[in-house]
Amino acid sequence: FETFAKTLARRLETEGRADVRLAIGAPRNLRVKLNELRDEGRQLGAIATAGPAGMEVIKAVPEKYPMFQQFAVLTPQPRKKSTFFTLDNFKNVTQRVVVIAIVAIGMTMVIITAGIDLSVGSLVGFSAMVGAWFIKERVIAAGGDPAAAGNFTVYSGFAVAILCAGLIGLFSGALVAYCKVAPFIVTLGVMMIARGMAEQANGGFTVSDTQLPAGFRELNHGTLIGIPNTVALLVLFYLAAHIFMSKTKYGRYIYAVGGNMEAARLSGVPVAGIILLVYTVCGLLAGLGGCLEASRVNAATTVMGTGLELEVIAAVVVGGTSLFGGSGRVFGTLIGAFIIGVMRSGMNQLNFKDPVQDMVLGAIIIIAVLLDRARQVGLWERLLKRGSPKAA
């Protein structure tokens, strides 16, 4: 499917199509691109889909997008064999997993402290919009030519976006640590606030690729000594997180807070400071995730990151971190992120619709929590003892 999409995009560009938009992933990504065209007042000449799930979106276009009435529909030739177990599909899965995996590092730390952060998806969308808007405004201030903007403009915009997301994470952590408000309530409220701010940025309109410098896409698509930037960032952050969690006293403090907060406090652990730290880190990494996602599609939309918190939490719990706090490993989270990514890829190839995919991920979270709870109460040990033969 992705090979078809990329090949078709290249062919249309060589035929002189001035504006080709590529939507890869779940059907909701196709709706995002349609929203971009609508917001920018552009016309829809042709639309391509690689499966029935995308066709459902296309059938609804005349009703939901009255401005798009006449357009061609292109479909691929029937596949002779599955492309699921191919190197290209693995690369595509890795590309999509990077944002989930990086954001999940911060979520792992939060959950180990027996907390939760429901705002990460909205922070991804917020930081994507803020970063792209800042860069667009700098381009306008410099004369309005995106081609004349340098890398400093791009990376200063990314830095502003990450810093803003980190400050929001700091705010969430302060409410949890010092005001003793339940993490679920705090981050639910922050989720709504951040989504509202994302929708207000740039007047609620998409920041399109025509308004951004060419260097904007380099963060996600560029390479470092031959290694894709996304892979380099993934390896760097996971190694750093592993060392921090397993080799430093602050990592041990995080586990102590989640294991028994009162005991940790009596032992001299700065509980409030640790809670503040993990929520701030989670916000910063969500900000980086938003920059990576915007760079991947070379644009920023107000709906970016919608539902991402579900995938991030699923990656953490599938990776073995207990939602009840006190245990978990960052490399387990990385494995969990790839499991979720592979499942998403498989469901896309099987043409599962977005609601079905969300139901599957929700079920995975519930099952993982139930299994963890069974482990905590010693259910497996009791079952093994009951099933073992009694001594004569």
Where are the predicted features?
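Short, non-helical or kinked segments that cap or interrupt transmembrane helices
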Residues: 110-127, 175-189, 253, 300-310, ...
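Membrane-interfacial amphipathic/re-entrant helices at transmembrane-helix boundaries
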Residues: 3-10, 16-104, 139-154
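Cytosolic-side transmembrane-helix boundaries in multi-pass membrane proteins
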Residues: 63, 266, 270-273, 347-392
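Transmembrane alpha-helical segments in multi-pass inner-membrane proteins
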Residues: 279, 286, 296-362
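Transmembrane helix-bundle core of multi-pass membrane transporters
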Residues: 155, 184-248, 274-277, 296-304, ...
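Membrane-helix/interface signature in polytopic inner-membrane proteins
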Residues: 240-280
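Single transmembrane alpha-helix segments in multi-pass membrane proteins
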Residues: 86-138, 174-181, 320-330, 363
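Alpha-helical transmembrane segments within multi-pass membrane transporters and channels
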Residues: 141-190, 335-336
